[in-house]
């Protein structure tokens, strides 16, 4: 439960449970009027676990390894200077992206993290990182670039001579699991299988560096009457994206609490402020909104903004 998480004196972050707890707390705050400390739970994720009684050193990685930006990946911050895992890097997107519908004040932070994370997740795939930075490039063709390496280490921990001084290294623990496990076991079906989460959420826009993130597709247990998308602009200037509508629509931003376009027929232009985010709800054109008890309600029945 959320109470069990918040009863901890410090972070116990490992893999997926704490990010799911963040979503649960945000949802219950919005929908049920709870008052859980979402900020504390988010800090526990991004600052990582420092307790010797937990998975010490587990967190969200920030920075560059060699020439590669690995910010946003999840794994050990301390093991050999850093050891990220693809499965763990993908999984937080599942709860974090829909979470911003309920706590839009975190849209910018989550949008920035997701942009970095989605970019860095490519580095686990043998067709997306150069051969000098992977442990078994001679075997990459067996993956068809659909199966990734399990992990990405800051430095090789097997002692392979050709990887001395190389950072990062796409790698896997398979050969360590049992004596005789082949090098091929560095490629990981369990790590690659959740990539559909990213495939469902992430879509490019006409502006490089700005992604359209679907806030509904992994929000599994709620009514979703309208499309909702998170856009984060990492640039120093306002950028104009092309919004592709599914119907004649009005666009309402629940971060700024304002309409940003009305009566779009097919494609429209939307401005995303510099270094900021929008969470855009696509409403059927002419939908009436009302403010009641701090909530914005569409057509007298669907809450689109909770605070």
Regions found by a protein language model. Give the residues of each.
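Long, well-ordered core segments of solenoidal/helical folds
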Residues: 1-13, 36-69, 112-129
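C-terminal beta-strand-rich structural cap/linker in extracellular carbohydrate-active enzymes
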Residues: 264-306
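Well-ordered alpha-helical segments within folded domains of soluble proteins
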Residues: 1, 14-28, 80-99, 194-196, ...
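Solvent-exposed beta-hairpin/edge-strand motifs
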Residues: 246-259
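C-terminal capping/lid segments that line or modulate ligand- or cofactor-binding pockets
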Residues: 89-100, 104, 136-203
């Amino acid at each position: 439960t959320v109470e069990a998480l918040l009863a901890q004196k410090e972070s116990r972050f490992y893999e997926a449970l704490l990010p799911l707890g963040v979503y649960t707390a945000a949802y219950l705050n919005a929908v049920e009027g709870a008052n859980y400390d979402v900020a504390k739970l988010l800090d526990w994720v991004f600052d990582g676990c420092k307790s010797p009684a937990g998975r010490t050193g587990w967190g969200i990685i920030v920075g560059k390894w060699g020439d590669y930006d690995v910010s946003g990946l999840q794994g050990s911050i301390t093991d050999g200077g850093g050891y990220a895992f693809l499965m763990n890097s993908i999984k937080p997107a599942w709860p974090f992206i829909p979470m911003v519908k309920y706590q839009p004040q975190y849209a910018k932070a989550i949008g920035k993290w997701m942009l970095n994370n989605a970019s860095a997740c490519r580095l686990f795939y043998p067709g997306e990182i150069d051969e000098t930075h992977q442990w078994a490039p001679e075997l990459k063709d067996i993956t068809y670039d659909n199966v990734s390496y399990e992990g990405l280490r800051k430095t090789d921990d097997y002692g392979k001579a050709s990887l001395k001084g190389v950072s990062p290294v796409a790698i896997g623990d398979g050969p360590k699991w049992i004596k005789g496990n082949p090098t091929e076991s560095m490629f990981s079906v369990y790590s690659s299988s959740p990539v559909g989460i990213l495939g469902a959420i992430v879509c490019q826009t006409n502006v490089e560096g700005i992604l359209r993130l679907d806030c509904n597709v992994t929000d599994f247990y709620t009514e979703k009457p309208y499309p909702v998308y998170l856009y984060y602009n990492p640039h120093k200037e306002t950028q104009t994206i092309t919004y592709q509508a599914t119907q004649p629509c009005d666009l309402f931003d629940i971060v700024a609490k304002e309409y940003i376009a009305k009566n779009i027929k097919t494609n429209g232009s939307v401005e995303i402020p510099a270094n900021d985010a929008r969470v855009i709800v696509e409403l059927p054109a002419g939908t009436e909104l009302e403010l009641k008890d701090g909530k914005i309600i569409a057509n007298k029945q669907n809450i689109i903004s909770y605070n």
